[in-house]
């Protein structure tokens, strides 16, 4: 059976595969479109197996919320090169995965991989994409938050995405404030909302470092604990969101800024995803 340019174009539109791959698959399938699609899918699986384990330090991060803005999700689709990260099909699949995550609200990244997009699971769709792009592709991150108000932020270039969950008030001004706080999280990468959220092991490590530094500086032994505690407090101010100076007005902390927007407004939680991290 002769393979026509029309057949090749139809297969390309259905699969996104390259022209020569489509021609080869159609020839092997003797012009049967369905068999050709299956052959291309199997080729993708072979490429995926060969590429598995390669570092996916590039990629595309997305964040969004549902219609009521009380649930949000972040996904990151990882790949090997920035060239693939900028590919329209790659970004389209990432958007489909995010939309699916928001609609179905799976509990874990593994649950998300098993949900279906147009008859294929997310993982199968990614494997198919590997065959088309020719490099390792992974669903490298999936995070969700639910609260009274959830606000997304995507940094320019789609390498960094943030969700911030707010409680205590609603309204357009709260959403604007949430965007400001999300941008602060993107820029300064706090490790917790406040000191109560910092792991004990981190606190102990910071105290030990502060004591050692004070000893090297020749401080009296009787002053070591006070000095260490003072430096720990500085660490909290620099690394916990509520205590950080607000980037748009450093006369206020983030907590004070939110209180100024609405009494009782606080950050309930936040998520930050950096491609390749």
Swiss-Prot record:
Compartments (UniProt record): Cytoplasm
Keyword Protein biosynthesis: yes
SUPFAM superfamilies linked: Elongation factor Ts (EF-Ts), dimerisation domain, UBA-like
Keywords: Cytoplasm, Elongation factor, Protein biosynthesis
Annotated region (Involved in Mg(2+) ion dislocation from EF-Tu), positions in chain: 81-84
Major localization listed first in the record, in broad terms: cytoplasm
GO CC annotation terms, alphabetical: cytoplasm
GO MF annotations in UniProt: translation elongation factor activity
Organism superkingdom: Bacteria
Function: Associates with the EF-Tu.GDP complex and induces the exchange of GDP to GTP. It remains bound to the aminoacyl-tRNA.EF-Tu.GTP complex up to the GTP hydrolysis stage on the ribosome.
NCBIfam families recorded: tsf
Family: Belongs to the EF-Ts family.
Listed name of the protein: Elongation factor Ts
Organism name: Amoebophilus asiaticus (strain 5a2)
Gene: tsf
């Amino acid at each position: 059976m002769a393979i026509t340019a029309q057949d090749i174009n139809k297969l390309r539109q259905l699969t996104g595969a390259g022209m020569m791959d489509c021609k080869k698959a159609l020839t092997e399938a003797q012009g049967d479109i369905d068999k050709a699609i299956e052959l291309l899918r199997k080729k993708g699986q072979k490429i995926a197996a060969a590429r598995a384990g390669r570092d996916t330090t590039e990629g595309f991060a997305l964040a969004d919320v549902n219609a009521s803005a009380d649930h949000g999700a972040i996904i990151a689709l990882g790949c090997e090169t920035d060239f693939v990260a900028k590919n329209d099909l790659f970004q389209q699949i990432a958007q489909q995965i995010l939309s699916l995550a928001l609609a179905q609200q799976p509990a874990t990244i593994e649950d998300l991989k098993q949900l279906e997009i147009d008859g294929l699971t997310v993982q199968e769709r990614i494997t198919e994409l590997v065959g088309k792009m020719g490099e390792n592709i992974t669903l490298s991150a999936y995070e969700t938050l639910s609260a009274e108000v959830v606000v997304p932020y995507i940094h320019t270039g789609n390498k960094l995405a943030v969700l911030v969950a707010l409680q205590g008030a609603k309204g357009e001004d709260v959403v604007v404030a949430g965007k400001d706080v999300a941008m602060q999280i993107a820029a300064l990468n706090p490790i917790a909302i406040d000191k109560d959220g910092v792991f004990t092991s981190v606190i102990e490590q910071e105290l030990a470092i502060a004591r050692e530094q004070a000893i090297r500086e020749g401080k009296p032994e009787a002053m070591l604990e006070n000095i260490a505690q003072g430096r720990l407090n500085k660490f909290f101010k620099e690394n916990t969101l509520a205590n950080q100076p607000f980037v748009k007005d450093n006369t206020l902390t983030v907590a004070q800024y939110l209180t100024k927007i609405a009494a009782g407004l606080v950050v309930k939680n936040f998520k930050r995803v950096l491609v390749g991290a």
